[in-house]
Amino acid sequence: MSMIPSFFNNNRRSNIFDPFSLDVWDPFKELTSSSLSRENSAIVNARVDWRETPEAHVFKADLPGLKKEEVKVEIEEDSVLKISGERHVEKEDKNDTWHRVERSSGQFTRRFRLPENVKMDQVKAAMENGVLTVTVPKAETKKADVKSIQISG
């Protein structure tokens, strides 16, 4: 627990003396964290969970309101998983009066460097209820051969 109170942490881990802290105060952060940018950050900063099972690496991205046609999953350079997409702004009709516009729009791109022990040719993606699931199967790791050596002497 820090001896100095933090006014900028928003309930996240913050410690100015910890070099590995996730949230050290940034004076320029306030310029980009207006309520407007926070509202639009839902799609622009798509949240992704990455878990590893014994069989695969599984990525889950929350993409509420997006259709699968608006999302792309690609493998770059044989080692980078790229998830990208775009939500378009609804067309305005000159006869309509908008009282509130809160749904986010914009583009997003997330990249993840994959480990060497994966089967790039067997990557699968599925989208259900606004959640994209990308499964990257693991390649079987070859167990090292152990050979006993006789000690002479």
UniProtKB/Swiss-Prot annotation:
Main location: cytoplasm
One cellular component term from this protein's GO annotations in UniProt: cytoplasm
Family: Belongs to the small heat shock protein (HSP20) family.
Gene coding for it: HSP17.6B
SUPFAM superfamilies: HSP20-like chaperones (SSF49764)
GO BP term, pick one: response to oxidative stress
Protein name (record): 17.6 kDa class I heat shock protein 2
InterPro entries registered for this protein in UniProt: A-crystallin/Hsp20_dom, HSP20-like_chaperone, Small_HSP
Assembly and oligomerization: May form oligomeric structures.
Keyword entries, A-Z: Cytoplasm, Stress response
Subcellular location: Cytoplasm
Species of origin: Arabidopsis thaliana
Domain (sHSP) ranges: 39-153
Record's keyword annotation contains Cytoplasm: yes
